[in-house]
Amino acid sequence: MAYSATQSKSGYQAGVKDYRLTYYTPDYTPKDTDVLACFRVTPQPGVPPEEAGAAVAAESSTGTWTTVWTDLLTDLDRYKGRCYDIEPVPGEDNQYFCFVAYPLDLFEEGSVTNMLTSIVGNVFGFKALKALRLEDVRIPVAYLKTFQGPPHGIQVERDKLNKYGRPLLGCTIKPKLGLSAKNYGRAVYEALRGGLDFTKDDENINSQPFQRWRDRYLFVMEAVHKAQAETGEIKGHYLNVTAPTCEEMFKRAEFAKELGAPIIMHDYLTAGFTANTSLAKWCRDNGILLHIHRAMHAVIDRQKNHGIHFRVLAKCLRMSGGDHLHSGTVVGKLEGDRAITMGFVDLMRENYVEADRSRGIFFTQDWASMPGVMPVASGGIHVWHMPALVEIFGDDSVLQFGGGTLGHPWGNAPGATANRVALEACIQARNEGRDLAREGNDIIREAAKWSPELAAACELWKEIKFEFKAVDTL
């Protein structure tokens, strides 16, 4: 029986619902305009997967635990989420992929905040579920067209920088905390003069007592302009404008613009999607590139059976707006299986991506010509990784070496030069038809013969490896 025996004089039955009767609809064919979601569901013992999947659909759309008389005032069948398919997760006990379709009318136009509030806002605390993970979403073109997306995109960025045919090189200034503004600017100048395209604030450098944001901006932009004049190349530094309030964030962004900064930075998860979308629109209006850091992502996406997969967070960022997004390295110190990583990298920068379960892509995604986001590979990488990084990420990426630049035994500028020489050698070898995956080490050794900076870097980091099995696998 779907409800308790309690009868109501108002024409409905009160009591606890059996979600399967309303929200499990295996005969439903999703519409082109539906938002689709794939959840990895681990039901509590004794809860059938159909009930668990239906509960997810209900609690993330129109459902509540009991029947209420106001149900009679609307067309619930039009607005409800529907669990239309359930598959057991291969190799796992009591885990299921539950596919849910949501009508487009459930979501506010142009609001990632509202979309996530609906789909994942409340259901993750549901008692009938032992664990729940949002693996993927399909955003219909009709909904995508309500979002601006990235402020500029990959091609516009290349045109602004006048740099083509290779990945861009970056460096995070270290130590991330504790430097005075003047010493921080000095490190920026040396790295840019040595051959890098960008330097970067780390995610947690905002405006602390040892270095207030205005002082940092002034010294950093002095360094950028000086390095630019000396090298003849366009340079930039990701000035972090993340702030306690949106008003303060825009104040910092405006000051960066006044100083001639070509790019600013934002921590999109800790600051929130509302702030990020607002900043992305400001960046488009003001012609400034937007670098996005994913600080806090692993709190949300690291566990295999609970949370939100990063491919969903990456899709949300593309909709909310950002020109760069950190994506892991595959070969460095941070978590990342190659197939899974390249799956969400393609979702960041390609216009049309086919479903491919081997890469964790559950739905075909048409981005409807929305500009792409450039993936940023950073975290524990050095010159020996360069061939693999170029082979894995291709030209439309930023390769960011923090310790791999500033840890050079001769200093920041030689560290930057070593990375630039290694990159140029790999690009030339690739363009000549050489196999970077097979001949990468030989290519680096050959280049090191005529670059003492690269030779010193090769000697320093020849034994450094991060060999841990990736957690993020299907």
Swiss-Prot record:
InterPro entries: RuBisCO, RuBisCo_large_chain_AS, RuBisCO_lsu_C, RuBisCO_lsu_C_sf, RuBisCO_lsu_fd_N, RuBisCO_lsu_N_sf, RuBisCO_lsuI. The modification N6-carboxylysine is found at K200. CDD domains: RuBisCO_large_I. Keywords: Bacterial microcompartment, Calvin cycle, Carbon dioxide fixation, Carboxysome, Disulfide bond, Lyase, Magnesium, Metal-binding, Monooxygenase, Oxidoreductase, Photorespiration, Photosynthesis. Substrate binds at N122, T172, K176, R294, H326, S378. Its EC number is 4.1.1.39. Binds 1 Mg(2+) ion per subunit. The keyword tRNA processing does not apply. Pfam families: RuBisCO_large (PF00016), RuBisCO_large_N (PF02788). GO terms for cellular component: carboxysome. The active site is at K174, H293. The disulfide bond which can form in the large chain dimeric partners within the hexadecamer appears to be associated with oxidative stress and protein turnover. It is an enzyme of class 4 (lyase). The keyword Oxidoreductase applies. PANTHER family: RIBULOSE BISPHOSPHATE CARBOXYLASE (PTHR42704), RIBULOSE BISPHOSPHATE CARBOXYLASE LARGE CHAIN (PTHR42704:SF17). Heterohexadecamer of 8 large chains and 8 small chains; disulfide-linked. The disulfide link is formed within the large subunit homodimers. Belongs to the RuBisCO large chain family. Type I subfamily. This is Ribulose bisphosphate carboxylase large chain.
